[in-house]
Amino acid sequence: MRFSYIVASIGVVAGCSSGTRTTQSSPSPAQVQAPAASAAEMRRDTAARASSPAGAGAGAVSAPNADPFASTYRPYASRATVIRNVTILTAAGPAIRSGAVLLTNGKIAQVGASVNAPADALVIDGTGKYLTPGIIDTHSHIGGAASPGDQGAQTDDVNEATNPVTANVWVEHSVWPQDPQLPRSLAGGVTTIQVLPGSANLIGGRSVVLKVVPSRTVQGMKFPGARYGLKMACGENPKRVYANRGPSTRMGNVAGYRAAWIQAERYRRQWDKWNETHQGDPPQRDLGLETLAEVLRGNILVHNHCYRADEMAQMIDIAHEFGYKIRSFHHGVEAY
């Protein structure tokens, strides 16, 4: 039986990108094109960037808590819209048969058997169709590992496989807003994605949360107020990628995590002391330790690629040792 969806379809494909990738058949850019931002959209994005205030401490010797790449996303102007006579899958309770949804200012305002819509609202008849909330995909490499994919330097930008610990990189600097996968995802009902670095490294760098909207810059897609994440990976991926230089074993992986967090603890204490007293010169900035220190402060959320139950337990032990929390395990095939 085929279901017809208006806003979103059910189903999320969450992928993993490690140091090696399998080649998959992909349409050529001529077959699938991301919608080019219109001149009005480009002007709006440029104006938003120009009007955005600089991060706290911008221009200072060091601004370890600033966001130098702040969101410039602005919602599109929209007309009040009501969808009637539709089966609503709320994801929070039973389905609503022959229900209605009111959208105002680009957001869901009312859901139920009936809604109070403005007289001038656009009315869409959803008879015979299903309606769901937009899907939030918390594990994506879209934009960073763009399609059509390759094994070279053109579109594969999610693994900075030059060191087992690359907390200094931010995946948003690899996101290509014209990736043809973006409109495909939106057509499938995915409205928000967390783009993660790949799983080649013990610590792969910062993630970013994006709205799936046309934009010429990644800042124009960034979800306002969403926290950064930190991608970590355990098990076979890092030890396979770094087998010739280390870590080449799981015990080497664990030693690598602990060494990184020990450095981050020291860095955090140095900066906390200077922020309290402002005496003397501030500590030298280190982008990688800066990210890890923000994890220890609770400002950046850890997302951990891990397969085996015993390794998940080990990662939880490490989190307890250094006082941070793991927000989610990804690919946790033994999480049950």
Which residues fall in each region the model found?
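Sec-dependent signal peptide recognition
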Residues: R2-S9
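C-terminal motif of bacterial Sec signal peptides marking the signal peptidase cleavage site
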Residues: V13-G15
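Bacterial signal peptide processing site
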Residues: S17-G19
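Post-signal peptide N-terminal segment of mature Sec-exported envelope proteins
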Residues: R21-D67
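Histidine-rich, glycine-flanked metal-binding segment
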Residues: Y73-A77, I88, A92-T132
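Polyanionic/metal-chelating signatures
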Residues: Q181, L186-I326, H330
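Active-site-adjacent beta->alpha loops and helix N-cap segments on the catalytic face
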Residues: E334-Y336
